[in-house]
Amino acid sequence: MIKKSAISLISYDAEYLADSIAKYYDFVDEIVLGLDKDRISWSNNSFKFDENKLWKDLKTLDVKNKIEVVEENFHPSKVAIENDNYERNFLKDKCTHDWIFSIDADEELVNAKHFFNNFVPLMETYYDKVDWMFTWLTPWKEIEDKTLVIANEDNSFHREAPQGFVTHKKNTFRYARWTNNTKQMLTPLVVLHWSLCRTEKNLKQKINNIGHSDIAKEDPFFQNWKHTDLKNWDQLKNFKTSGFGNNQWPKLVCVDTNSLRHIAESQLQLAY
């Protein structure tokens, strides 16, 4: 079996990172994490996180010494997406192995075991030819013991446009996780993306610091998010995405937070 390197990022999303890594830790051979040495984001804003907690959580998780933290200047440009690309390529080049799995801190793999044990072995012969994509499911907002999730008209969780996440080391990240490789393949991997489902303070921080922050800051979705509550959530229809293309989010569904992951798993057959 071809060895796998995973890369991820430490910044304002650090509180999600250990849980994210835990989903794929057993299935990759090394994990390279990037952290700006000055604690400056891609958008050239300073950030803080609970470093003691993260180091403790990673130490507990890393029973096989797979994790390496690389601290460098990851904000050489004034343009956020250029810094995004720079860091991902830097981490890729630090990897020991050629098969690169890029999974961000706020991404939680729903069906990691099936993906790595069943799908990957069947398709690894193409590891140096085709980039792989997964599908996002996007929780919108947690309120009390409920979570609002972006959904389709039939109430199934809405699947976002596929996202690139696996490539060969010879390729170059050109726009976030999209590379110069034009050959891409959708995989059955489904990922809960916690990009929006966070506190108002943390969401504002996300909007102002992500690689496409220049786009996200101009998008109206934050006001929609801010005013959504348990009384009006069902009134939000065909609302705007976070800055890319003309895609719309059809509606929301309200589920018990404790049932969210079970529901996501039950809908895996809809991944393609």
Residue ranges and their predicted role:
Residues 3-5:
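Cell-envelope/extracellular polymer assembly enzymes that use nucleotide-activated donors
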Residues 7-13:
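Short, glycine-rich nucleotide/cofactor-binding loops
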Residues 13-51:
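Short, well-formed alpha-helical segments that are part of the catalytic scaffolds
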Residues 36-99:
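Active-site-proximal specificity loops/subdomain of glycosyltransferases
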Residues 77-92, 102-103, 108-272:
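Catalytic-site signature of metal-activated, phosphate-bearing donor transferases
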